[in-house]
């Protein structure tokens, strides 16, 4: 099984390329946001604990997120691969993720870092805001989100580069062109793991 992380600034195409990986390879997509919402809706013990933090305006602790992911991935032993979206965002989260995967005899195999120039990110997000009506896709909020991403993610890029799993991918062009840049990376690792 391949464990794939997709990094990239807001508007870099992470969601779109995740969909391409699912379509091409049958991978399972795990989004921390979706996972939290599902646990809260199901009123599980973990979901109730998370709701308590959220309702008080606090971030859900890393340990709780990792516990939710652990619960989910333990059911995914027969999948071709997992795409992690929105996690990890910090070095402690990355370390916790490595420990969690190691419990199953797995590791982070591939980190895809979608690289898109800032001007193009802003243009994509502004266009997305017009289409989707998302209130967080305005220029002021976009710049703040890009700054937060740059500050939080730079250490992770170094972290995964040192582990020789980071692959920078040019994130400009059509959806298909970008997917064709990613495919050889994934194909190489699929051959090695089979």
Swiss-Prot record:
Q: What's the superkingdom here?
A: Bacteria
Sorted alphabetically, the keyword list is: ATP-binding, Cytoplasm, Kinase, Nucleotide biosynthesis, Nucleotide-binding, Transferase
Q: Which Pfam families match?
A: ADK (PF00406)
Where is AMP bound in this sequence? Answer: 32, 37, 58-60, 86-89, 93, 134, 145
Region entry NMP, spans? 31-60
* InterPro entries assigned: Adenylat/UMP-CMP_kin, Adenylat_kinase_CS, P-loop_NTPase
Q: Where is this region: LID?
A: 127-137
Q: Which GO terms describe its cellular component?
A: cytoplasm
Q: Which reaction does it catalyse?
A: AMP + ATP = 2 ADP
State the SUPFAM superfamilies in the record: P-loop containing nucleoside triphosphate hydrolases
Q: Where in the cell is it found?
A: Cytoplasm
> Single Gene Ontology BP term?
AMP salvage
Q: Which GO terms describe its molecular function?
A: adenylate kinase activity; ATP binding
Q: Where do the annotations place ATP binding?
A: 11-16, 128, 173
Q: What is its main location?
A: cytoplasm
Q: Which PANTHER family does the record associate with it?
A: NUCLEOTIDE KINASE
Q: Which family does it belong to?
A: Belongs to the adenylate kinase family.
Record remark: domains: Consists of three domains, a large central CORE domain and two small peripheral domains, NMPbind and LID, which undergo movements during catalysis. The LID domain closes over the site of phosphoryl transfer upon ATP binding. Assembling and dissambling the active center during each catalytic cycle provides an effective means to prevent ATP hydrolysis.
Q: Relate the protein's function as given in its record.
A: Catalyzes the reversible transfer of the terminal phosphate group between ATP and AMP. Plays an important role in cellular energy homeostasis and in adenine nucleotide metabolism.
> HAMAP family, per this entry?
Adenylate_kinase_Adk (MF_00235)
NCBIfam families the record matches: PRK00279.1-3 (NF001381), PRK14527.1 (NF011100), PRK14531.1 (NF011104), PRK14532.1 (NF011105)
> This chain belongs to which protein, by name?
Adenylate kinase
Native organism is: Porphyromonas gingivalis (strain ATCC BAA-308 / W83)
């Amino acid at each position: 099984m391949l464990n794939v992380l997709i990094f990239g600034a807001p508007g870099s195409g992470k969601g779109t390329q995740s969909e391409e990986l699912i379509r091409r390879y049958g991978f399972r997509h795990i989004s921390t946001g979706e996972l939290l919402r599902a646990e809260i809706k199901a009123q599980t013990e973990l979901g109730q604990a998370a709701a308590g933090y959220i309702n008080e305006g606090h971030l859900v602790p890393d340990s709780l997120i990792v516990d939710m992911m652990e619960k989910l991935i333990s059911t995914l032993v027969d999948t071709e691969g997992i795409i992690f979206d929105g996690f990890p965002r910090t070095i402690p989260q990355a370390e916790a993720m490595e420990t969690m995967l190691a419990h199953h005899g797995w590791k982070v195999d591939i980190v895809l870092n979608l690289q898109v120039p800032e001007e193009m990110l802003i243009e994509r997000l502004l266009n997305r805001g017009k289409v989707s009506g998302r209130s967080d896709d305005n220029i002021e909020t976009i710049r703040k989100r890009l700054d937060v991403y740059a500050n939080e993610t730079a250490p992770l890029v170094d972290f995964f580069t040192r582990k020789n799993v980071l692959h920078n991918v040019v994130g400009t062009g059509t959806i298909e062109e970008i997917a064709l840049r990613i495919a050889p990376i994934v194909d190489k690792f699929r051959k090695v793991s089979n």
